[in-house]
Amino acid sequence: TFNNLTVLPDMSMVKKLGKLDCAYNKIKTIEKAFGRDVNLVQLSMDHNLIEELPRDENGSFCGYADVESFSFAYNKLKKFPNIFSSQSVYVMSSVNFSFNEIDGFEGEEDGTFKGVNANTIAIGGNKLKKFPTILFKTNSQVSALGLNGNGIEEIPKGTFSASKYSYMMKTLDLTYNKLSKLPDDFNGRNMPFLYGVDVSNNRFTEVPTGPMDAATLTVYAVRSQRDENGNRLLRKWPSNISLCPSLRQFCIGGNDLRKITDTISSYIIVFEIKDNPNISLNLSNVCNMIKAGAYLLIY
């Protein structure tokens, strides 16, 4: 870490290697794949200049039997590498390819992409202009998916109904994209265990109601919806917010909400409405909770 290494030498002979941290170097080349006999537990190659990952004769970069963290954030990769498999019996804790130059997936066009089996997949800060439906088509098993800051304009219809593992999804970060709507299959029927969804800094004119179908939805953020010129887009209050039984935190600041006639649910104990210049609402039913410190109002 924090050196001037430009080439990672062949380490395939180090069969018992478990942790490797080469972050903050100047690595452009990985000389040779570790191979599937090297089962890394933690690999950090963040903040380098890596453009591609080598493979062994079996198409493997390394072994994945005990992976906790596998990170290539802040590099120069152009494609999400086809080195994992959604059918693997081993579940990786986290896979991080954030802040590269990724605009697609290896094997997506010819149908050879094998998917991913990981609790968390982070690919924010890349160049994915279209939603990565390939993860769902290949039945990738993921609980938390980070797609922030990609400029994604659309999520194709049928994305979440196409996978038999959509029900595993719990957390979605879709902030800083260009979405204006969510497909009908983005709902609690396909993702019944959704915990948190953040669609802040997009282009919605109304609060998407699909995620509210999930009985477990606890955190929902729809902050700062703007058009390409920076104009505020969201003015309408979601009428069915009271139908979300588990919602405890609702963040809708930075919009242009007007008069709200709906009764604010006392179950929402963190309510953020700051930077809505024209907002008007009645909070009398939660005043006692605010005084008691049991309700956090951010305005």
Predicted feature locations:
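Consensus "Asn ladder" position of solenoid repeat domains
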Residues: N3, C22-N25, N48, F72-N75, ...
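C-terminal capping region of solenoid repeat domains
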Residues: Y195, S200, T216-R232, L243-C251, ...
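Canonical leucine-rich repeat
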Residues: L8-M11, I30, L53-D56, F80, ...
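Hydrophobic anchor residues at the C-terminal helix/turn of individual leucine-rich repeat
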Residues: M11-M13, A33-R36, E57-C62, F84-S86, ...
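Conserved hydrophobic beta-strand positions in leucine-rich repeat
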Residues: G18-C22, V41-M45, E68-F72, M92-F97, ...
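Conserved hydrophobic position(s) of the canonical leucine-rich repeat
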Residues: L5, L17, I27, L40, ...
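Surface-exposed loop/turn motifs in large extracellular/passenger domains
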Residues: R36-N39, C62-E68, S86-S93, K114-N119, ...
